[in-house]
Amino acid sequence: MIRIPLKDGGERRFRHRGTRADLGVIAQIFKAQDYSLRPLRRGRELESLYGRIVASGKAPLILDAGANIGASAVYFKRSFPASHIVALEPERNNFELLAENTAGLDVDARCAAIGSADGETSLVDPGEGEWGYRTSVGAAGERVSVLSCTRLVAESRAAGQVPFIAKIDIEGGEAELFSRHTDWVDLFPLLIVELHDWLLPRAGSARSFLRCVAGRDRDFVYRGENVFSIAYEWAGG
């Protein structure tokens, strides 16, 4: 258990298992500030956009795909308290901690994977620890639900939320996610994506993402392990 300081001066308890994976993700997010917008040249512009969405009476939508035990969701909620977060994690034990660590926040935690279309896939444990589970359509393994970005964004917009950030860290699953049905990309001012060619050499897992964003008017900024893809202009809600 750790205590995370909040902007209002309070603290929030955050439970972990003491494993290398859990401690690693906590260090990346809360100590190294992997998802902070402040180092970005356009960071203040994005923070200003967040303020305008809130001032309009709507909730900024943050989509957290590969939410693990909830560190990223809690970080985003601390940074953008008026946001609504949809957090997806397909591995059951991780999901249980995600649900516990985000209880009482405006976080819609779902035990599911993300993909280009609704359906099912297999969950595979390659032995990388609790942060390394992968999904594969043709592999043997536990069957898990897949929710499409198109569906999630449509549901959120129908509820009056405005796409703001999509954070995607899905251990190579980006190959399938960005392979088709990518109109939702244009609705998010900011994508934060970890690519996994370093983990999966010769698999081409980054290829579909690169093809998807190459033809769009977006900045492409590498920071740490993540790509920050920032739209030139905002598409609006």
Task: State the predicted function of each range.
Residues M1-G237:
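Phosphate/nucleotide-binding beta-alpha loop and adjacent structural elements of enzyme active sites
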